[in-house]
Swiss-Prot record:
GO terms for biological process: translation. NCBIfam families: L28. GO terms for cellular component: ribonucleoprotein complex; ribosome. Keywords: Ribonucleoprotein, Ribosomal protein. Belongs to the bacterial ribosomal protein bL28 family. This is Large ribosomal subunit protein bL28.
Length: 103
């Protein structure tokens, strides 16, 4: 069970712990992950994903999962997120979306 965000791919990073005397020791920073259920309004589906808190705040700020994925570059998304994004684009293009008038 890896500690990686399913949407952005954010994972453990490394740095230094610096003491008062300025000694530096290696340390790692873990991602604050949460198991959440995100709803796609266009597809009318729920997706159970492991998401970083930072990503979750960004999704809320952008207006939901659909708008976040459509307005984010595919290079910044994981393969799981790219598949969801493709399904959303196809649903909008074919007119089979649950709420096509909102986007």
């Amino acid at each position: 069970m890896s500690r990686v965000c399913d949407i952005t791919g954010a994972s453990k990073s490394f740095g230094n712990k610096v003491s008062h005397s300025n000694r530096k020791t290696k340390r790692s920073y873990l991602v604050n992950l949460h198991n959440v259920t995100l709803v796609s309004e266009v597809l009318g589906r729920k997706f159970r994903v492991k998401v970083a808190s930072r990503t979750l705040r960004t999704i809320d700020y952008k207006g939901g999962l659909d708008l976040y994925l459509l307005n984010t570059s595919s290079r910044k998304l994981t393969e799981v997120a790219r598949k969801i994004k493709r399904k959303i684009k196809v649903a909008i293009a074919t007119g089979k979306s649950k709420q096509s008038d909102n986007i």
